[in-house]
Amino acid sequence: CVNNGDMDTDLGRCSGILATANTGTTLEDCTNNGDQVNKNTNGRLGNIVCNVSHYCTLKNCVNNGDIDATATGYKGTAGGIFALAGAATIVIEGGANYGTIKTLSTAGKYVGLLWANHNNTIPTSGLVASGRIIVDGVEREINASNYMEHIGYMKNPACVTDVTWV
């Protein structure tokens, strides 16, 4: 599946491929090339998928699009590939983000190049982290020595392996 369309919206859950991956969904070799401008102030934004549920697999999905979540008072989440993955039964293998994530500091810690909130013991490997993060109009300094600090919130970082920066 491929999305080449840009999104200009005011939705709480919006992505280039699928809003919510419910139980048992597999997204494989999906590519998002569309940029998302979202005016919602409390969204879960991911340019491949917003929310990932039990027994789902994300495999070799690539995001090339940007997310602009700079609506006044924004306090939602934003990640290049997904916003929230919360079940230990999810598998994430391969994939990459090359897009820019723009948001406000009111979003807090749930902003990342790859995801916003990786909230369990989810086996995750083989990803490429790239792109940029801009918060309150200021670009974060991301490089080969600190990129793991910017891939997104991780409840259990030991589950995340083989992530490279380009």
Language model: regions and residue ranges:
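Surface-exposed loop/turn motifs in large extracellular/passenger domains
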Residues: 1-166
